[in-house]
UniProtKB/Swiss-Prot annotation:
A GO MF label: manganese ion binding
Name of the gene: pckG
Species this chain originates from: Thermococcus sibiricus (strain DSM 12597 / MM 739)
Cited PANTHER family: PHOSPHOENOLPYRUVATE CARBOXYKINASE, PHOSPHOENOLPYRUVATE CARBOXYKINASE [GTP]-RELATED
The protein's name in its UniProt record: Phosphoenolpyruvate carboxykinase [GTP]
InterPro entries per record: PEP_carboxykin_GTP_CS (IPR018091), PEP_carboxykinase_C (IPR013035), PEP_carboxykinase_GTP (IPR008209), PEP_carboxykinase_GTP_C (IPR035077), PEP_carboxykinase_GTP_N (IPR035078), PEP_carboxykinase_N (IPR008210)
Assigned EC number: 4.1.1.32
Amino acid sequence: MTPEDYLKKRLDPEQFEKIKGIDNPELNEFLAKYIELLNPARVFICTDSKEDENYIRRRAIEYGEEKSLAMEGHTIHYDGYYDQARDKARTKILVPKGVEIPFINTMDREKGLKEIHEIMKDIAKGKELFVCFFVLGPKNSVFTIPAVQLTDSAYVAHSEFILYRKGYEEFKRLGREAKFLKFVHSAGELDERKTSKNIDKRRVYIDLEGETVYSANTQYGGNTIGLKKLAFRLTIKRAVEEGWLSEHMFLMRINGPNGRKTYFTGAYPSMCGKTSTAMISWENIVGDDLTFIVDMKGEARGANVEKGVFGIIQGVNQEDDPIIWEVLHSPNEIIFSNVLVKDGKPYWNEMGIPIPDEGENHSGKWWRGKKDSEGNEISPSHKNARFTVSLDAFPNTDLEALETPCGVRVGGMIFGGRDADTWPPVREAFDWAHGVITMGAALESETTAATLGKEGVRAFNPMAILDFLSVHIGKYLKNYLEFEKKLRIKPKIFAVNYFLREKDGKWLNHKLDKSVWLKWMELRVHGDVDAIKTPVGYIPKYEDLKRLFKEVLNKDYSREDYEKQFVIRVPEFLAKIERIEKIYRDVGNIPEELFKVLEEERHRLIEAKEKYGDYISPFKFL
């Protein structure tokens, strides 16, 4: 029986007609294989119609995966108590036998496929399977990557309708030409709260060769929303093979003088200020998480892979996050997950207002002081609780930039690290290679706040991409360095660090100071201000920052603060070079240029140290 004949026999006539309209034998083969394997009771094919999207929304409520909240458009979804985050241990990249890739959890492909197919046999029995079509990047553009998602979770399908552009018509347009990504998900057997029961059989297997991701016995978005971090592994591999960049970066517009618009991307590890930077209220957001960057006629053009936000809700409060707060308290289409609900209203940790003493949360019925089976007190919401919302709900979204098929020109790229004592608040690279290597490839995040006499642990996280790499880091960096050669106009590269501390542990910067660094970077992209050359890159002049602090924040900025923040800390910089160099030497197969650029930086620092000492005032470089 041909795949088409099987589908005709297995699907309702109305659903079969939807598939027939696409005319793609590879798609038919894929659907036939996995509908037979998962063995659902019924199959629903989603087109781009509003009716089909509404059907998914309705099913999420009817199947008990979501419940309506008091405000129109708001729903709550709960994942299982032990299904609240990405499962790093059971997320594996399937590779040919004997292949190992540094930093990556790999598994023999044949063995992995055999295991996941056994786990998924009949896993959707008695359930409804949804087949959804989406695209990554703007439609009908150089960025477009079509993708098909099979899932028996209406919550997962609903999330994807909020986060991604619909792709059924794009599949029809491309027909047999479509080079598409594939995602197969089942939540598995559900308990009485409609959460995945067999967590011991939770698996997330990424088959690079087949460009397919399998996800079983889990509901948490990071493990199940195929087009997010699962697709990201596949697009990183594609980008490296095809010579473009698939990055873990926000994309935002910084508004310069006289209505000038300049677009920046930014890669920051978790807890380093990525979302708060992208959401500054007087600038404009294009995307908060994933960006494709391609060469178009010698320009680096960027596009948001997504059209929505799957954001961490903990700590979102009215004072620090006015825009997100407003969005979450308006009648938008929002899925809240793993927060506390009382009388139809959502509450979360550190929201800055009183939280009820009881209600329902990810642990079931909750009361203050409730403990789990290990004796840990359960907080009102999970620390990884989320909100899922479309970007068009945000008043400061640059909607034109979000959907333009040719993307936006990237003027600057920002790498945001976190340390108490090394990187100054903002600096600019000398050139592309210097930025890629000493800023992007050397990105670290201090995991604990440094206290007196005790240093935080610095997690190495180049380009904030380590968790998602699907190729050798050397290959990934080589592609980055090669990409520059295609460009006539090169984005400037910057590094930021919002977390410097004084010796007594006090922060050296206020939360909103970052908005000044952004304005300075925007001016530098256009050559509107000069900068001071130091051994580690260009830093701002005091006079320029003094003026910008007044203009942007209406704050006085003292010479003393400037000096404390922008002092070049030579011993700390040298120690960092040592750390980064060792990591890459141990890994092997790294472009030689990386070691050359690090050595040049070391040489400049030692020279400056001999002249000015260990801690060099920025005024010394004038």
